[in-house]
Amino acid sequence: MMQVFSTELAEREGIYGAVIIQRLAYVIMKRKSSENHKEGYAEHKYWYTTGIMGLLRDLPYISYVHIRGTIDGLVSRGLLQKIVFKQTKERGRRPNWYTFTADGWRMLYEFHII
């Protein structure tokens, strides 16, 4: 798999931040534009439903610690919103749901990600 990121965004958010932000933006925008608009849609927002382990599978070259720290930092700085929405049928698995806040969407536009 080939992945790219904005170097300007990486200057501000670090390489891990840029890669994770662009991965989340890609999945959320893909859901928004898909024919099945209801997938990942709740509370009038599109979400990326995954856990840290899911992101680790998507981004195997970034460690668990770096993914967790980057996500927590983006949430604490108000760029991402994170919730545990509902329990799934998979043995009580409760994935996190992520979406961008208004500041996060502004950042995506500012850096021409979307």
Language model features by range: what are they?
Residues 62-67:
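Short coil turns linking two alpha-helices in DNA-binding domains
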Residues 87-100:
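Minor-groove-contacting beta-hairpin "wing" of winged helix-turn-helix DNA-binding domains
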Residues 1-57, 68, 72-75, 102-111:
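Short recognition helix of helix-turn-helix/winged-helix DNA-binding domains
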